[in-house]
Amino acid sequence: MSTYRSPDRAWQALADGTRRAIVERLAHGPLAVGELARDLPVSRPAVSQHLKVLKTARLVCDRPAGTRRVYQLDPTGLAALRTDLDRFWTRALTGYAQLIDSEGDDT
């Protein structure tokens, strides 16, 4: 589904618990696939597939380190996700304030 905007892909990617666990681990610093797989209940190839989804969603990026690839959180993708969340939160608070104001008008 390549028509989604980047934040939509990010939200979709984070709907999976294993991918959320990977993001949480990477919040502590860069790690290679093997290091990530060590503490997850899935195989190393499965971790690689999850990382591919996270990379497509721009939540992680990678760099070569010898014979390995090291993954880290992608600040650009996380910023887009934060902007999307802030926009949602602002709309929710505005709606709540309007509801409170309208209930006050009824009394």
UniProtKB/Swiss-Prot annotation:
Alphabetical list of Gene3D superfamilies matching this protein: Winged helix-like DNA-binding domain superfamily/Winged helix DNA-binding domain (1.10.10.10)
Domain HTH arsR-type: 1-93
SMART domains in the cross-refs: HTH_ARSR (SM00418)
Free-text activity regulation comment from the record: DNA-binding ability is not susceptible to zinc, nickel, cobalt, cadmium, lead, copper and manganese ions.
GO molecular function list: DNA binding; DNA-binding transcription factor activity
Record feature DNA-binding region, as residue ranges: 33-56
Domain of life: Bacteria
Keyword field: Activator, DNA-binding, Repressor, Transcription, Transcription regulation
Keyword Metal-binding: no
GO biological process, one term: regulation of DNA-templated transcription
Pfam family, one: HTH_5
Induction, per UniProt: Negatively autoregulated.
Zinc is among the record's keywords: no
Subunit structure, interactors included: Homodimer.
Primary role: Involved in the regulation of lipid metabolism and hypoxic response. Positively regulates transcription of various genes, such as phoP, groEL2 and dosR. Negatively regulates its own transcription. Acts by binding to a specific palindromic sequence motif in promoter regions.
Protein name: HTH-type transcriptional regulator Rv2034
Organism: Mycobacterium tuberculosis (strain ATCC 25618 / H37Rv)
